[in-house]
UniProtKB/Swiss-Prot annotation:
It comes from Mus musculus (Mouse). GO terms for molecular function: ATP binding; ISG15 transferase activity; ubiquitin conjugating enzyme activity; ubiquitin-protein transferase activity. GO terms for cellular component: nucleus; ubiquitin ligase complex. Interacts with RNF14. It is found in: Nucleus. This is Ubiquitin-conjugating enzyme E2 E1. ISGylation suppresses ubiquitin E2 enzyme activity. Autoubiquitinated. SMART domains: UBCc. It comes from the Eukaryota. Pfam families: UQ_con. The active site is at C131 (glycyl thioester intermediate). Its main location: nucleus. There is a cross-link at K136 (Glycyl lysine isopeptide (Lys-Gly) (interchain with G-Cter in ISG15)). Its EC number is 2.3.2.23, 2.3.2.24.
Length: 193
């Protein structure tokens, strides 16, 4: 073997081992990074699960008037809620079912709350989506699911036609209240009793 061949062989083996070292070094931070993000997710999960457990205990001991809520099954992040139509409202006598979905980011992100029971309301669309500021931009970690349910009950008593999700119902509410109320009562009787 000549000196040139020997140098080339040494050079290629040292560059090969340096490549392997770089590859190892490159993969190590990725592993650490994924462990960090997994750890962060676990921490969020445990924070959210603890908070949801506490709220479940609170709502079981002291439910908001005309409301109930709790997990659908074993999954603490999936709840079913029942709201009775507020007395004196066009929804009186109705029983409305809602789905509540918490994310691992709860309480830093709002829960997703949707009506499962059809309802004639300018702030609730046909898919059950609710237009309520505290479920969007005005969410605060200080809010609880009990306060959310109370706000929804309040929305059933006093809708917000100035910020509608269903424009035609809002217009009817403002221009022909008697017809609006008749339709809301009819839907309540048909879908919520």
């Amino acid at each position: 073997m000549s000196d040139d061949d020997s140098r080339a062989s040494t050079s290629s083996s040292s560059s090969s081992s340096s490549n392997q070292q770089t590859e190892k070094e490159g993969s190590t931070p990725k592993k650490k990074e994924s462990k960090v993000s997994m750890s962060k997710n676990s921490k969020l999960l445990s924070t959210s699960a603890k908070r949801i457990q506490k709220e479940l205990a609170d709502i079981t001991l002291d439910p908001p008037p005309n409301c109930s809520a709790g997990p659908k099954g074993d999954n603490i992040y999936e709840w079913r809620s029942t709201i009775l139509g507020p007395p004196g409202s066009v929804y009186e006598g109705g029983v409305f079912f809602l789905d509540i979905t918490f994310t691992p980011e709860y309480p830093f992100k709002p829960p997703k709350v949707t009506f499962r029971t059809r309802i004639y309301h300018c702030n609730i669309n046909s898919q059950g989506v609710i237009c309520l500021d505290i479920l969007k931009d005005n969410w605060s970690p200080a809010l609880t699911i009990s306060k959310v349910l109370l706000s929804i009950c309040s929305l059933l008593t006093d809708c917000n036609p100035a910020d509608p999700l269903v424009g035609s119902i809002a217009t009817q509410y403002m221009t022909n209240r008697a017809e609006h109320d008749r339709m809301a009562r009819q839907w309540t009787k048909r879908y919520a009793t």
